[in-house]
């Protein structure tokens, strides 16, 4: 079972990241809510961060944002996926999967408006990573991202990487027949059927009642890669896949083998020692900064190497 207790305690212990002050402002575009962390309006890089399944950007991701935004040339945008958090849309569903992918274009365009000269990077955690893989390989996007970070990515049942857990220990429980009917109908039937249940502990829901506990077929299809091996192989932008060594959902070794087997010259693998599926959010910032440093000029290589793993 995912260790929510550890995550909540860690989030409390961090408080406001002391590595440097970044201004935070809230924004909204086409019903999408986002929070922007930055030092100046002239940032050279902006990282757009997408949360994991059922939660929203307020679920500890501000710690990651402040860690990253301690780099003065870098801004961070935390987004609530449509149907989550403060974004509009019926909770846990969407009229069609493509709407979620189009929303990434909307946010990237908004970041281009705010930072005309900045490079734009996408970071997805868990199901947010699966969604970004779909966006980059299944949607004819109008915007261009400069790099991608997949943090403890949930690549779905077609990746073959899930741990063999008892039903009571699984975070997500799935009814298969609505997905089958939806696929056979070309997406016309049962798109709004609530086919996925997310098993948040009662204490977590008491503290965060806005978490989404059920996903429709359409929402699940938006977040879940259909052919993850082929989709990973199709990536053509600098990509870092970060695995959590103590991930409760899948083993880091299986993720590494998946990258070695299906990745390409653009895809690198990194391991976050001691991290769980959730706590990796607090441990990823140095790897992310190094990834951007290697792909593009940001800060000082020597300075970042001093912080790195």
Annotated model-derived regions:
Residues 1-39:
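An N-terminal hydrophobic leader/cap segment in hydrolases
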Residues 54-66:
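The serine-hydrolase catalytic nucleophile loop
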Residues 54-57, 85-111, 115-119:
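Catalytic nucleophile-loop/oxyanion-hole region of alpha/beta-hydrolase
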Residues 69-88:
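Conserved alpha/beta-hydrolase
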Residues 125-217:
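Alpha/beta-hydrolase-fold enzymes
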Residues 235, 241-243:
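Short beta-strand/loop motif that positions the catalytic acidic residue
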Residues 248-254:
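Conserved alpha/beta-hydrolase "acid-adjacent" motif
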Residues 275-285:
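Catalytic histidine-centered segment of alpha/beta-hydrolase-like enzymes
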């Amino acid at each position: 079972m995912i260790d929510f207790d550890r995550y909540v305690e860690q989030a409390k212990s961090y408080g406001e990241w002391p590595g440097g002050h970044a201004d935070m402002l809230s924004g909204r575009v086409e019903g999408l809510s986002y929070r922007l962390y930055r030092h100046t309006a002239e940032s050279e890089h902006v990282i757009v961060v997408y949360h994991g399944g059922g939660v929203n950007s307020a679920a500890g991701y501000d710690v990651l944002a402040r860690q990253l935004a301690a780099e003065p040339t870098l801004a961070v945008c935390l987004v609530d996926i449509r149907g989550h958090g403060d974004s509009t849309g019926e909770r846990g569903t969407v009229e069609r999967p493509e709407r979620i992918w189009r929303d990434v274009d909307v946010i990237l365009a908004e970041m281009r408006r705010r930072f005309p000269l900045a490079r734009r990077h996408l970071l997805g955690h868990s199901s947010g990573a699966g969604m970004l893989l779909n966006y980059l390989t299944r949607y004819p996007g109008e915007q261009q991202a400069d790099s991608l970070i997949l943090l403890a990515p949930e690549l779905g049942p077609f990746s073959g990487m899930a741990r063999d857990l008892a039903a009571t220990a699984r975070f997500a429980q799935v009814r298969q027949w609505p997905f089958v009917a939806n696929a056979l109908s070309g997406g016309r039937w049962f798109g709004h059927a609530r086919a996925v249940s997310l098993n948040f502990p009662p204490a977590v829901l008491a503290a965060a009642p806005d978490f989404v506990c059920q996903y429709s077929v359409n929402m699940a299809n938006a977040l879940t890669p259909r052919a993850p091996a082929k989709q990973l192989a199709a990536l053509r932008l600098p990509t870092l896949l970060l695995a959590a060594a103590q991930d409760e959902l899948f083993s880091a070794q299986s993720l590494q083998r998946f990258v070695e087997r299906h990745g390409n010259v653009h895809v690198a693998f990194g391991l976050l020692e001691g991290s769980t599926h959730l706590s990796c959010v607090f441990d990823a910032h140095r790897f992310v900064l190094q990834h951007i440093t290697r792909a593009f000029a940001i800060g000082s290589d020597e300075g970042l190497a001093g912080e790195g793993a």
